[in-house]
């Protein structure tokens, strides 16, 4: 949506909402919001955006890992990307999946979760649950914005948390 709404203290140029239907049968599920990507104009004061995000989420973490929902054809690896804090890149994360998944049900969760996360296997499940977070936020601008954004942006993503809620049903 092209917009000039104010988010995190600055006017935006575009806000994109991504929805996903987690019901694998398609019979009863409704799409749920899993990600919001916010693009800011070139002249936006991204230091203000970062400070406003710090008010909401606390200090930036040193790094976070996000897992993509898509793989390249023929690629069976777990598609992951690690974002490391820099002058123009701040990152936040919620609880790790390992902290919320009951240890006595880990195998059950892993078996079901494989249908939701490309490249996830028994071999990488433990590492995945340690690094994946219920929700993440990224504020990237200037030289750090590409390739996530074409320019200044914020990304709020909660796909793992949504899958967790679906699997625990």
Stretches with model-predicted labels:
Residues 1, 27-169:
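Non-cytosolic coordination micro-motifs
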Residues 1-28:
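Compositionally biased P/S/T/G-rich terminal and signal peptide-adjacent segments
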């Amino acid at each position: 949506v092209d917009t000039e709404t104010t988010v995190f203290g600055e006017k935006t140029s575009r806000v994109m909402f991504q929805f996903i239907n987690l019901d694998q049968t398609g019979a009863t599920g409704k799409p749920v919001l899993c990600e919001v990507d916010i693009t800011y104009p070139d002249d936006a004061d991204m230091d203000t955006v970062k400070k406003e995000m710090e008010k909401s989420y606390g200090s930036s973490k040193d790094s976070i890992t996000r897992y993509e929902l898509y793989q390249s054809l023929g690629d069976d690896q777990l598609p992951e990307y690690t974002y490391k804090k820099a002058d123009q890149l701040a990152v936040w994360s919620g609880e790790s999946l390992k902290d919320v998944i009951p240890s006595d049900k880990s195998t059950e969760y892993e078996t079901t979760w494989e249908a939701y996360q490309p490249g996830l296997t028994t071999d990488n499940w433990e590492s995945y649950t340690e690094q994946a977070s219920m929700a993440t936020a990224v504020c990237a601008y200037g030289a750090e914005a590409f390739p996530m954004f074409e320019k200044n942006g914020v990304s709020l993503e909660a796909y793992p948390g949504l899958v967790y809620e679906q699997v625990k049903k």
